[in-house]
């Protein structure tokens, strides 16, 4: 508790930007996954607005790279019909239309900007607020919105969506790394961004070109192993052998350690990653909650302790249950990526043992959302319902 009091006192005396940036490194890293997709339509300015209102430390998001070289905030390799709707072609007779179902790498920014990605509530997230007509944003547009919405030095955990198994479905790691460097340099935001990727080659290239940029090695038990002969990634109990397509040519079984947890951490350390971001639950698990029989955690205390001994932090994804939150606290993780940042924030406040980032100014944030959020011509009322 004393550390929280000291941190609050210091921030109350001085609010200069460098100090705020230091403070954000001291907060428990509460990350809103895709902004907080359990609460608001994912990877959109509305989701990031509510992430700020809920007091996240870090806005987590994903990037696609369009055919004409624009970074779009979006998770999927293609335009998912459960999340977006077509509103019309850019020009009459466009052979790529309809755009829904097409891959981001094959679409231009103009084509992507016709999509309504704010009207559809996902079945798996029935409490999502929708903002009808919302367009996808570029990385630059997202930074501009956040700059308007808060003076806090909120952090960004940004994934480059590179497909390690099927390289023709996305732009290359080289293309992504070049593109993010141009935008991060333009905004001089290096010390607030973590570059995360399942495709570790992107992280290797990132460290070579931008050594000041933090990198996070994403993985689950389908990406740390070589594909099975049937093309699937497998899991902890059934998988291929040899170098994984996702780990920049590394074979985790060649690294020292009695357990998979130790070996994968050492593999991440070998590419100079600053942190690891494993799936909370293993693909081999037959249950979704630690309280249930058959639950298998991919992240465990051995993994956390090994990472910390090598100077790496551990921030797992995607924890959406209170029992998972408690499990992760118990094994000593440094942050949690969740679809429900409001619920995690409530639990952290109740525990009272972790310093937390400030909650956002609702009026200011919503004013900036009204200014920056772009809508298709078929937009609804824009109020979130």
Q: Where in this protein do the model-derived segments appear?
A:
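Phosphate-group recognition and catalysis centered on beta-loop-alpha active-site segments
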Residues: 2-5, 12-385
């Amino acid at each position: 508790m004393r550390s929280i009091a000291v941190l609050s006192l210091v921030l109350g005396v001085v609010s200069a930007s460098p100090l705020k940036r230091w403070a954000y490194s001291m907060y428990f890293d509460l990350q809103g996954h895709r902004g907080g997709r359990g609460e608001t339509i994912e990877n959109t300015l509305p989701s990031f607005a509510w992430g700020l209102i809920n007091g996240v430390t870090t806005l987590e998001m994903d990037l696609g790279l369009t055919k004409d070289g624009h970074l779009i905030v979006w998770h999927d390799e293609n335009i998912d019909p459960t999340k977006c709707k077509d509103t019309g072609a850019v020009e009459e007779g466009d052979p790529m239309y309809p755009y829904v179902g097409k891959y981001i790498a094959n679409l231009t920014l103009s084509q992507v900007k016709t999509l309504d990605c704010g009207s559809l509530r996902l079945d798996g997230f029935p409490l999502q607020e929708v903002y009808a007509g919302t367009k996808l944003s570029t990385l630059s547009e997202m930074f501009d919105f956040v700059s308007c919405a808060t003076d806090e030095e909120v952090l960004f955990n940004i994934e480059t969506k590179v497909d390690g198994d099927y390289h023709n479905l996305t732009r290359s790691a080289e293309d992504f790394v070049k593109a993010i460097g141009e935008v991060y340099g333009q905004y001089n935001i290096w010390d607030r961004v973590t570059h995360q990727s399942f495709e570790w080659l992107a992280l290797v290239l990132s460290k070579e070109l931008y050594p000041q940029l933090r990198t996070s090695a994403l993985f689950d038990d389908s990406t740390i192993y070589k594909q099975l002969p049937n093309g699937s990634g497998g899991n902890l109990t059934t998988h291929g052998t040899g170098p994984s397509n996702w780990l920049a040519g590394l074979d985790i079984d060649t690294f020292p350690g009695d357990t998979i947890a130790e070996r994968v951490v050492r593999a991440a350390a070998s590419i100079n990653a600053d942190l690891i971001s494993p799936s909370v639950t293993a693909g081999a698990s037959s249950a979704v909650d630690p309280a249930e029989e058959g639950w298998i955690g991919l992240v465990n205390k051995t993994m956390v302790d090994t990472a910390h001994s090598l100077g790496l932090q551990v921030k797992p994804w995607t924890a959406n249950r209170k029992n998972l939150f408690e499990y992760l606290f118990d094994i000593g993780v440094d942050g949690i990526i969740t679809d429900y940042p409001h619920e995690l924030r409530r639990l952290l406040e109740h525990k009272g043992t972790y310093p937390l980032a400030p909650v956002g100014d609702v009026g200011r944030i919503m004013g900036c959302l009204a200014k920056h959020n772009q809508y298709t011509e078929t937009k609804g009322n824009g109020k979130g319902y």
